């Protein structure tokens, strides 16, 4: 039976602004998203029957039809009237419920993997159109690299970034945060500081990590930090260990710091990992989902 291996990469937000709440309940956002070299390994293998069977090494994610990667496979099969079945195995390395789009990345990898495995010939744009019906971050995870995301996150403008291979340290505290609860608690009238998106985009294009680090802003911190003071604690530690800037990614609770060199990132990682079990040292990545 045919099979395919994929690397399903995480993302961080270099900025996140919420512009308004729509009548359908969704929030319109303006955010800069950056792929990083932290990934889950995914194996997709054909089955003799028509079933979708998902398994994983992680006890914290479902293996039923509620799993976003399962939904991606089901949606693609349904859309193209495909009766073939598949096994999906997810070797989870990206922290769960962390603001890093781990689930969305898995869904994107499944869409891309099945497109390749079954020689469907769908374009990235067509895959993104399917992906947005599953989750707002799925289109970016298909695109990869660096992008400005607008709408509910599905309107993407690729950015010609010059901050390639920048060293990042991530810390995911031992708490879980509900994205829905964070957005539900956000009071748009009380947001004072918003990301200077145009200036950030210019700094990214110029490869100026000092300006990127100093101008990063996430308005969702106004909610999550108040509920979970540990996020502020981690940000302070990042700066003490020579980060150029530190910020919460997405709705949290993961905090990341940007470092100007491998040596400084490694030193910070070694110190932070003494306090926080889920600490990671990674780089920015610009290659999208990797097959094989």
Swiss-Prot record:
Residues at which ATP binds: 95-105
Gene: ispE
The protein's Enzyme Commission number: 2.7.1.148
GO-annotated biological processes: isopentenyl diphosphate biosynthetic process, methylerythritol 4-phosphate pathway; terpenoid biosynthetic process
InterPro entries assigned: GHMP_kinase_C_dom, GHMP_kinase_C_sf, GHMP_kinase_N_dom, IspE, Ribosomal_Su5_D2-typ_SF, Ribsml_uS5_D2-typ_fold_subgr
Gene3D superfamilies documented for this protein: 3.30.230.10, GHMP kinase, C-terminal domain (3.30.70.890)
Secretion signal, residue range per the UniProt entry: none
Gene Ontology molecular functions: 4-(cytidine 5'-diphospho)-2-C-methyl-D-erythritol kinase activity; ATP binding
Keywords: ATP-binding, Isoprene biosynthesis, Kinase, Nucleotide-binding, Transferase
Name of the protein: 4-diphosphocytidyl-2-C-methyl-D-erythritol kinase
Pathway: Isoprenoid biosynthesis; isopentenyl diphosphate biosynthesis via DXP pathway; isopentenyl diphosphate from 1-deoxy-D-xylulose 5-phosphate: step 3/6
Reactions catalysed: 4-CDP-2-C-methyl-D-erythritol + ATP = 4-CDP-2-C-methyl-D-erythritol 2-phosphate + ADP + H(+)
Physiological role: Catalyzes the phosphorylation of the position 2 hydroxy group of 4-diphosphocytidyl-2C-methyl-D-erythritol.
Active site positions, chain numbering: 11, 137
Family under the similarity heading: Belongs to the GHMP kinase family. IspE subfamily.
Recorded superkingdom: Bacteria
């Amino acid at each position: 039976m045919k099979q395919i291996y994929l690397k399903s990469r995480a993302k961080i937000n270099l900025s996140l602004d919420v512009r308004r709440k729509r009548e359908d309940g969704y929030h319109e956002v303006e955010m800069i998203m950056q792929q990083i070299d932290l990934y889950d390994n995914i194996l997709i293998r054909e089955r003799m029957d028509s079933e979708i069977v998902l398994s994983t090494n992680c006890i914290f994610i479902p293996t039923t039809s509620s799993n976003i990667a399962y939904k991606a496979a089901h949606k693609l099969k349904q859309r193209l009237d495909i009766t073939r079945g598949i096994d999906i195995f997810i070797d989870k390395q990206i922290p769960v419920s962390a603001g890093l789009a781990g689930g969305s990345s898995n869904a994107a990898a499944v869409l891309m993997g099945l497109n390749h495995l079954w020689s469907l010939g769908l374009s990235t744009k067509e895959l993104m159109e399917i992906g947005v019906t599953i989750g707002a971050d799925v289109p970016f995870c298909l695109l990869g690299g660096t992008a400005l995301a607008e709408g509910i996150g599905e309107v993407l403008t690729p950015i010609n970034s010059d901050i390639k291979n920048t060293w990042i340290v991530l810390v995911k505290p031992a708490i879980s945060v509900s994205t829905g609860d964070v957005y539900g608690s956000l009071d748009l009238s009380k947001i004072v500081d918003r990301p200077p998106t145009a200036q950030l985009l210019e700094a990214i294009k110029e490869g100026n990590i000092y300006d990127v680090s100093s101008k990063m802003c996430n308005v969702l911190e106004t909610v999550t930090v108040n509920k979970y003071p540990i996020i502020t604690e981690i940000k302070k530690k990042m700066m003490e260990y020579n980060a150029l800037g530190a910020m919460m990614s997405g709705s949290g609770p993961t905090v990341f710091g940007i470092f100007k060199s491998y040596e400084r990132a490694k030193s910070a990682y070694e110190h932070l990992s003494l306090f926080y079990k889920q600490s990671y040292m990674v780089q920015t990545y610009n290659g999208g989902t990797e097959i094989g």
